[in-house]
């Protein structure tokens, strides 16, 4: 039986490489179990033994985080040499790493020439922390309070590129091999650049890899996917991933939400709330997190707090109140702290947990709503010319 691993199909958005440039070997880091099985077959392993070899590769890549085939000591030297001739173990390039005064770390990662995303590690006061990952470069939603919304969508990230963000952070934090003791990254939040539900296939595959107990092993219950309200995909997200759900809400009526989150014009609040109520597994042990950015004089009145309580009636939920994090030329100001506390008091008295999120990483523009890269979308006509220059079909 013939088997072919189509690496180009996995990275269909990646730009073509000029023929004069040595072609980079495809990396095993970010591949699924099935893809690793096909790699084994491609390297001459008998089909009946390929699953076992894939398991070995998986453990070395995702449990131990190795970056050299020489470290894979339970795989024969001959097989390692064959694999190393065809594949690599590299991560995407880490361009910049900034550390905030509060310990927050921001990583600028180059996925391809001119294509960059940002990832943020947020340490907790206890021995835990969350890694905020991106699912797209840029965004299409144009939320008016979010810096990423000022950057046009460049492209979706592949599952491998999402997983790579976790691996790069673990490299930096010295978190290999995987251990249940003294972990720094205990939670994954899809709250970085982009709308995850507009890239659900790759997001779901990345969660399968990240949550696997024999690898990185960050469970689905410790993974939260945030959406601005892509209603048709919410139930599918729950069915496919089993993760926690967060909603980027920010307003309690359609008029204001249309302004803050323009996606609301397509999927208004009544449709959004119905989709949330249908989320698989919803209950007191699996509450929805509602994110509410506090904008001075815009959505922070006590009347809005009461309207929020009414809107969420009957939904197991907690509300994260997020002090607005400014960015250059942003049109909003953060609510006064006394007003935020008064707002939280109304929500708390109604029986909802409503923690006020402590701003983290503001000094390095790593806080909520501040992420943005300088990547720009390459026009389709330019990509076609690149493909023709490489001798490929313009439709490739």
From Swiss-Prot:
The name under which this protein is listed is: Dual-specificity RNA methyltransferase RlmN
Q: Does the keyword DNA damage apply?
A: no
Which GO cellular component terms are attached?
A: cytoplasm
Q: What positions does the domain Radical SAM core occupy?
A: 125-363
Q: Which segment of the chain is annotated as a signal peptide?
A: none
The question of whether Metal-binding is a record keyword is answered with yes
Q: Where found, per UniProt?
A: Cytoplasm
Q: Which organism is it from?
A: Maricaulis maris (strain MCS10) (Caulobacter maris)
Q: Give GO terms: molecular function aspect only.
A: 4 iron, 4 sulfur cluster binding; metal ion binding; rRNA (adenine(2503)-C2-)-methyltransferase activity; rRNA binding; tRNA (adenine(37)-C2)-methyltransferase activity; tRNA binding
Q: Which reactions does this protein catalyse?
A: adenosine(2503) in 23S rRNA + 2 reduced [2Fe-2S]-[ferredoxin] + 2 S-adenosyl-L-methionine = 2-methyladenosine(2503) in 23S rRNA + 5'-deoxyadenosine + L-methionine + 2 oxidized [2Fe-2S]-[ferredoxin] + S-adenosyl-L-homocysteine; adenosine(37) in tRNA + 2 reduced [2Fe-2S]-[ferredoxin] + 2 S-adenosyl-L-methionine = 2-methyladenosine(37) in tRNA + 5'-deoxyadenosine + L-methionine + 2 oxidized [2Fe-2S]-[ferredoxin] + S-adenosyl-L-homocysteine
Q: Which GO terms describe its biological process?
A: rRNA base methylation; tRNA methylation
The UniProt keywords, alphabetically, are:
4Fe-4S, Cytoplasm, Disulfide bond, Iron, Iron-sulfur, Metal-binding, Methyltransferase, rRNA processing, S-adenosyl-L-methionine, Transferase, tRNA processing
